[in-house]
Swiss-Prot record:
Catalysed reaction, written as an equation: a ribonucleoside 5'-phosphate + H2O = a ribonucleoside + phosphate
Function: Nucleotidase that shows phosphatase activity on nucleoside 5'-monophosphates.
The encoding gene: surE
Main location: cytoplasm
Name of the protein described by the UniProt record: 5'-nucleotidase SurE
EC number: 3.1.3.5
Keyword Metal-binding: yes
Any one cellular-component term (Gene Ontology): cytoplasm
Cofactor binding, per record: Binds 1 divalent metal cation per subunit.
Organism for this UniProt entry: Idiomarina loihiensis (strain ATCC BAA-735 / DSM 15497 / L2-TR)
Domain of life: Bacteria
Entries under Pfam families matching the protein: SurE
Record's keyword terms, sorted: Cytoplasm, Hydrolase, Metal-binding, Nucleotide-binding
Binding site for a divalent metal cation: D9, D10, S40, N92
Length: 250
């Protein structure tokens, strides 16, 4: 049976990770190591200036006072590490599409698994709310079972977004590319009860492209979106242009 390390960024008590654990334990041996609080937006951050403390909960999950990346690193490259065949992160309670992946702790946990040489999956709900986690859990469990029977040998992270609906209403699956969002709305300015100036992030931007092969379009049309993400962030198609430009500056 495949051995899975399961983490997330919404925290070890979040309903998404509980639902995903229930689905995955039917097809794999699952170990949960997750943050002790919500770490949404943590991206690939590490805890470098404080010790990491791990607590085993009554349900067998491990709670960590660190980031999603810390949790996966603990589970794969520390004295508490065990054999792992696959890293899975989620279920995030909202989409991780387009530019979201740069900020997402959900995607970052999967990226850390890939960085440690393991296949990895990040899974998020295509809508905001706490319903239909069972839909996403079933989708991922089916993919994991297929991966065990027929290994997918790609040097990538699979970023999966699942429509916010019941399983029977899913229209299918599309392999997609990342879309783009408009810039976020202006930060909100306020003052705390003591009169000190404070700021809050404004709402995220809406999607900026209606291309047919993006993650946004797939979710909008009722399809599961699977986007392969690479650790190599080199903009390869621009290297010749940059080389020519540098030559002209001599």
């Amino acid at each position: 049976m495949m051995k899975i390390l399961l983490s997330n960024d919404d925290g070890v008590h979040a309903p998404g990770i509980l639902a995903l654990y229930q689905a995955l334990k039917e097809v794999a041996d699952v170990r949960v190591i997750a943050p002790d609080r919500n770490c949404s937006g943590a991206s690939n951050s590490l805890t470098l200036h404080n010790p990491l403390r791990v607590r085993r909960l009554d349900n067998g999950f491990y709670s960590v006072n660190g980031t999603p990346t810390d949790c996966v690193h603990l589970g794969t490259n520390s004295p508490m590490a065990e054999d792992v065949d696959l890293v899975v992160s989620g279920i995030n309670d909202s989409p991780n599409m387009g530019d979201d992946v740069l900020y997402s702790g959900t995607v970052a946990a999967a990226m850390e698994g890939r960085f440690m040489g393991l296949p990895a999956i990040a899974v998020s709900m295509g809508g905001r709310g706490h319903d239909y986690y069972d839909t996403a859990g079933r989708v991922v469990a089916e993919i994991v079972a297929n991966m065990e029977n027929d290994p997918l040998r790609l040097d990538t992270v699979l970023n999966i977004n699942v429509p916010y609906t019941t399983y029977d209403k899913l229209k299918g699956t599309r392999v997609t590319k990342l879309g783009r969002r408009h810039r976020a709305e202006t930060m909100v300015h306020d003052r705390d009860p003591f009169g000190s100036e404070i700021f809050w992030y404004g709402p995220i931007g809406h999607h900026a492209s209606d291309e047919p092969n993006t993650d946004f379009t797939a979710i909008h049309e009722g399809y599961i979106s699977i986007t392969p993400l690479s650790l190599d962030m080199t903009a390869q198609r621009h290297t010749d242009t940059l080389t020519d430009w540098l030559e002209q500056q001599k």
